[in-house]
Amino acid sequence: MKPEIHPTYQKVVFMDTSTGFKFLTGSTRGSSETIEWEDGNTYPLIKVEISSDSHPFYTGKQKLADAGGRVDRFKKKYNL
């Protein structure tokens, strides 16, 4: 590999801001915020709005998002 053209791969902590769930993984993304992890080391902290802990597909709490009655208009249009 050519030197100095690839991003730095490091361990980071992702935190789901809606649930507070945190997980440690590898990423090329960095952050100025840091957090001390369970192992005593400090890692960059990346905040995300949705993760597998809060996403409706993974939690089983899916519901139909009807924006402005579009589903009703579709059903009415096609007599469903």
From Swiss-Prot:
One MF annotation (Gene Ontology) recorded for this entry: structural constituent of ribosome
GO CC entries: ribonucleoprotein complex; ribosome
Gene3D superfamilies in the cross-refs: Ribosomal protein L31
Family annotation (SUPFAM superfamilies): L28p-like
Keywords of this entry: Ribonucleoprotein, Ribosomal protein
Domain of life of the native organism: Bacteria
Signal peptide residue numbers: none
UniProt xrefs under Pfam families: Ribosomal_L31
GO biological process: translation
Subunit structure: Part of the 50S ribosomal subunit.
Family, as annotated: Belongs to the bacterial ribosomal protein bL31 family. Type B subfamily.
Protein name in UniProt: Large ribosomal subunit protein bL31B
Organism, as annotated: Shouchella clausii (strain KSM-K16)
Gene responsible for this protein: rpmE2
